[in-house]
Amino acid sequence: YEIGKEIALKGALLMTGGTSGVMEYSSKGAKEAGGLVVGFLAGDSLDRANDYIDIPITTGLPFDFRSSVLIHSSDAVIVIGGCNGTLGELSCAYLNNKPIIVLEGSGGLSSKIKAFAYEGCYIDERKNIKIDFCQDAKAAVETAINRCKKGVRKKETISRKNPEQPDLI
């Protein structure tokens, strides 16, 4: 909930897998704070979209490929809890040099990343992109936004017709 709320309060756009659990709670937080929420859904149906999604996008793809589209469309990734799907998204973000921020204390995969990370902050010895670890939602969102502002994502990969559009996280 708090991650979505903080993202909205910063004027950024929340993008999730659009269904239940952490995705729904963060979407609710964003909506209640006046934010905009995009849900990237596996398959062709809107049936699984949670009630807080403003823009549901059916990808026509199975879950794992839907996650790749979501990660590729994001400027940064905040990892909360998670299991095997989150592991795939983490790997995809790392391979695509997306800023990765882990919300410590959120359980699941998030509680294990630092232990298996190379030098405590990389997936492997290639050191594609450093993983940041934050203790609370506000710090995680601020870190994500700051990492985006430092030009981690190559400028030519961003296409915005309207400069007033919110930042994507």
What are the residue ranges of the model-derived segments?
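Short acidic-hydrophobic, aromatic-tinged amphipathic segments that line or gate anion-handling sites
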Residues: 56-61, 128-140
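Structural motif
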Residues: 17-18, 40, 80, 103
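C-terminal amphipathic helix plus adjacent low-complexity
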Residues: 145-169
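Short, acidic/small-residue loops that bind anionic groups at enzyme active sites
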Residues: 41-42, 87, 95-116
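Short alpha-helix at the nucleotide-sugar/activated-sugar donor binding site of glycosyltransferases
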Residues: 31, 71, 94
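Glycine-rich oxoanion-binding loops at beta->alpha junctions
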Residues: 40-77, 81
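Glycine-rich beta-alpha loop segments
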Residues: 1-38
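Short glycine/serine/threonine-rich phosphate/pyrophosphate-binding segments
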Residues: 22-25, 67, 85-90
